[in-house]
Amino acid sequence: MTTSVSLLGASGSVGESTLRVLRAYPQEFRLHSFSVHSNLEKAREIQKEFSPEFLCVSDSTADRTVLGNKIGKTQVLYGESALCELVREPEVQIVITAIVGSVGLRPTIAAITSGKRLGIANKETLVTFGPLVNSLIAKHKTKVVPVDSEHNALFQLLESLNRDSVEKIVLTASGGSFRDLSVEQLAYVTKEQALHHPTWNMGPKITVDSNGMINKGLEVIEAHFLFGVPYERIGVVIHPQSIAHGIVELKDGASFVYASYPDMIFPIAHSLFHPEPVPKSLRSYSAKDWGKLEFWEPDLKRYPGLGLAFEAGKAGGTAPCIFNAANEAAVELFLKDEIRFTEIPDYIWYTLDEMPIDFPTSLEEYEEVDRIARKTVLNLKARKVVSAC
């Protein structure tokens, strides 16, 4: 009997890797439904190959005459609200949320409250709304398996260890494309340079985040909410080879390391099959192929956004929500060539400084904080606060 999967964000890098896994295991899984934001050509290709029950184009301004309302047996839905309809479908058993940004929140909550198993790759949902999402996960006893390579690695390690023996969890980071540049050189990084990553093929926003290690900061906050580990016991190391994806340090001084070829098919396959083991290798890669492995601590002068993430996480309340929203707004300005790469963390810092930290209890309150933080970034830009410093 095949397991029905709903894939949100099918046209992105995680979505494409998920489709690779589904192709490798046609007897085990079938694509029940999927979404794209606005890539209609990609949507047509996926529909033709997998013939799912539903297809959602989340961009409400998309030209509806291109795909219409039905292709073969596939119903075509439009708008962000339709994402929730997909995951609530009774036949859906597993939901993979690979949508970038806080837009992934409502479909993630819909999956949690509908009793679906959740493979979460949308880190912004936990970063922005962590306490609220965790309370819903506990209430509905939802099984959540992280899809990000680092969190999936830590998930597998922690599942196999006695939690009382754990001293610290460590996320690895490639260091991005600019790890060898001086701090002075970073000020002149171009958009074209920032959209290149040495290891992973990702979308523009995540690539920019990764090159400034703000992405790793988001992952630190996500790890806190996923695993319940205090920030003082979460570490980050730069590991350029991207072979080791997660490290668990034990109280006795020993460490366990999860290592694999840097390919998203490994964590995705694990999240789909869990708690059963993945039945066959998708890509052979042994220790003799690793070569030299290097690890070192990140320089927070080079990566100030990482330090800000730890500060926001420790502050708690709405601070992570403000951090994420300010970053998304600042990255958007950078991609429009309106601010420098090195100004992104400055906008985050000033937004955190200008906004009070609250402790909301409702989704609407969190969303209002998110909205105000984005508006604050634009106000800072208009007032030339950052560039004046």
Swiss-Prot record:
Pathway: Isoprenoid biosynthesis; isopentenyl diphosphate biosynthesis via DXP pathway; isopentenyl diphosphate from 1-deoxy-D-xylulose 5-phosphate: step 1/6. GO terms for biological process: isopentenyl diphosphate biosynthetic process, methylerythritol 4-phosphate pathway involved in terpenoid biosynthetic process. Keywords: Isoprene biosynthesis, Manganese, Metal-binding, NADP, Oxidoreductase. SUPFAM superfamilies: 1-deoxy-D-xylulose-5-phosphate reductoisomerase, C-terminal domain (SSF69055), Glyceraldehyde-3-phosphate dehydrogenase-like, C-terminal domain (SSF55347), NAD(P)-binding Rossmann-fold domains (SSF51735). Mn(2+) binds at D148, E150, E219. GO terms for molecular function: 1-deoxy-D-xylulose-5-phosphate reductoisomerase activity; manganese ion binding; NADPH binding. Its cofactor is Mg(2+); Mn(2+). 1-deoxy-D-xylulose 5-phosphate binds at K123, S149, E150, S174, H197, S210, N215, K216, E219. Its EC number is 1.1.1.267. It holds the Pfam family DXP_redisom_C. NADPH binds at S11, G12, S13, V14, N39, N122, E124, G203. It catalyses: 2-C-methyl-D-erythritol 4-phosphate + NADP(+) = 1-deoxy-D-xylulose 5-phosphate + NADPH + H(+). Catalyzes the NADPH-dependent rearrangement and reduction of 1-deoxy-D-xylulose-5-phosphate (DXP) to 2-C-methyl-D-erythritol 4-phosphate (MEP). Belongs to the DXR family. NCBIfam families: Dxr (TIGR00243). This is 1-deoxy-D-xylulose 5-phosphate reductoisomerase. The lineage of its organism: Bacteria, Pseudomonadati, Spirochaetota, Spirochaetia, Leptospirales. The gene is dxr.
